[in-house]
């Protein structure tokens, strides 16, 4: 039986913090909006191959979501598909033969249509676009390799991961599992502003290499948001469970669409710096229908069907997270060899056979009233509110957040319980 050194890959798709902006006008912010040059970046994404890869990753987003949702119908779901795709695409640089093919095809890429070099080139452009200095999206991306002190990596692998994926490499002693765990966790805490702590809970002494990939997102709504008041209201987790949660109440004009095929309301919120969130609220007992029928093409059709309407919106404050061991999920998507003794990672290191033993993914989503302005006289307001359609996000709903420049999906998830961490 050949000797096999297992190593862990830690996929961190860190913080998504959706913070509505205040009503206080910021002259610099308004000027920046008027002179926002980010639309000039659109030309970078006229490349049909890169557009195709964005479609592939969006399809992967729905695949990942459905796999994770099937694991538990009673828990929140949150995943960052672009982060997962980039981490495994980067890892594929060190794989060969069937292991490499399986990873890239598992990411929904058609290798007969798209050259492998183009895949990495497009992901490089995604990283550059998401890190563009002129954006006020406040989105930070990065990755780091933690390499066992006794292990020498192939130079071309280090060079390619640094050039294409801006990856760093740090030496670490995995034999001292506590020290290694602390070093990785400190790195994650620092890069995410301590929003994600104690990510790594266990490490094996035979771990040789770990990959940490993260996305940190802090968005401001373009439309000035005003919470007339925050009320504690019921949220229907399921048919038998109702919890009390703070609800942000707002009467205003929104991009909203009533989708009959999905039996759902779809609310769009645009963010300063070119990102859009879609909140999809199915009718009671229709979540199964939404999950079954929602596809990327359907979402595209919805984006062309939005109306600007005045509604009375009730939206819960929430802070949810998702932590997943991706091994089972990726196996269901056809990525299996890299987890087995048949894995070919000789492009990473030629010192000993390697296989992937751990793949952990973490995402965090927060929505609250920070930066909003509360107003008085709620009883007078309520008279006016009765004239408008009320849309209450008081039951499970989906959320999809995408980057408008690259069209890559940043987050996809389901809110089942706004209070469930």
Curated annotation (Swiss-Prot):
Ranges that cross the membrane: none
Keywords tagged on the record: Endoplasmic reticulum, Glycoprotein, Protease inhibitor, Serine protease inhibitor, Signal
Pfam families: Serpin
Organism ancestry: Eukaryota, Metazoa, Chordata, Craniata, Vertebrata
Domain statement: The reactive center loop (RCL) extends out from the body of the protein and directs binding to the target protease. The protease cleaves the serpin at the reactive site within the RCL, establishing a covalent linkage between the carboxyl group of the serpin reactive site and the serine hydroxyl of the protease. The resulting inactive serpin-protease complex is highly stable.
UniProt-annotated site: Reactive bond, residues: 385-386
Modifications made to the protein after synthesis: Glycosylated.
Molecular function GO terms recorded: serine-type endopeptidase inhibitor activity
Listed GO CC annotations: endoplasmic reticulum; extracellular space
Family: Belongs to the serpin family.
SMART domains linked to this entry: SERPIN
Primary gene name: SERPINA2
Tissue expression pattern: Expressed in the liver, leukocytes and testis. Also detected in brain, colon, uterus, esophagus, spleen, trachea, kidney and lung.
Protein's recorded name: Alpha-1-antitrypsin-related protein
Function of the protein: Putative serine protease inhibitor.
InterPro entries, per the entry: Serpin_CS, Serpin_dom, Serpin_fam, Serpin_sf, Serpin_sf_1, Serpin_sf_2
């Amino acid at each position: 039986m050949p000797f096999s050194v297992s190593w862990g890959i830690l996929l961190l798709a860190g913080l998504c913090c959706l913070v509505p902006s205040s009503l206080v006008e910021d002259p610099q912010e308004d000027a920046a909006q008027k002179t926002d040059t980010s639309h000039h970046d659109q030309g970078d994404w006229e490349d049909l191959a890169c557009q195709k890869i964005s479609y592939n990753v969006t399809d992967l987003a729905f695949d990942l979501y459905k796999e994770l949702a099937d694991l538990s119908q009673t828990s929140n779901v949150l995943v960052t598909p672009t982060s997962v795709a980039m981490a495994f695409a980067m890892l594929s640089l060190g794989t060969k033969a069937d292991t490499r093919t399986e990873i890239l095809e598992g990411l929904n890429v058609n290798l007969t249509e798209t050259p492998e070099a183009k895949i990495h080139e497009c992901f490089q452009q995604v990283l550059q676009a998401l890190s563009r200095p002129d954006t006020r999206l406040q989105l930070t991306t990065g990755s780091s390799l933690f390499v066992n002190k006794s292990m020498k990596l192939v130079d071309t692998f280090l060079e390619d991961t640094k050039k294409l994926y801006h990856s760093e490499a740090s030496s670490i002693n995995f034999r001292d599992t506590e020290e290694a765990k602390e070093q990785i966790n400190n790195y994650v805490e620092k890069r995410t502003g301590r929003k994600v702590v104690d990510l790594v809970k266990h490490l094996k002494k035979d771990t040789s290499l770990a990959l940490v990939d993260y996305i940190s997102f802090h968005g401001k709504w373009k439309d000035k948001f005003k919470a007339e008041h925050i009320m504690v209201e019921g949220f229907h987790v399921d048919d038998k469970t109702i919890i009390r949660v703070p609800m942000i109440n707002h009467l205003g004009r929104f991009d909203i669409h009533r989708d009959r095929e999905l039996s759902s309301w779809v609310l769009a919120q645009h963010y300063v710096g070119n990102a859009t969130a879609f909140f999809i609220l199915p009718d009671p007992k229709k979540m199964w229908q939404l999950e079954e029928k929602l596809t990327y093409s359907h979402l595209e059709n919805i984006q062309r069907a939005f109306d600007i309407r005045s509604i009375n919106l009730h939206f819960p404050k929430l802070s949810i997270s998702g932590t997943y061991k991706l091994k089972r999920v990726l196996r269901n998507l056809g990525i299996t060899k890299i987890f087995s003794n048949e894995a070919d990672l000789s492009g990473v290191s030629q010192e000993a056979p390697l296989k992937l033993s751990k793949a952990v993914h973490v995402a965090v989503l927060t929505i609250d009233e920070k930066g909003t302005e509360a107003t008085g006289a709620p009883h007078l307001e309520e008279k006016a509110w009765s004239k408008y359609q009320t849309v209450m996000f008081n039951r499970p709903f989906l959320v999809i957040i995408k980057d408008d420049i690259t069209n890559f999906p940043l987050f996809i998830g389901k809110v089942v319980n706004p209070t469930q961490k």
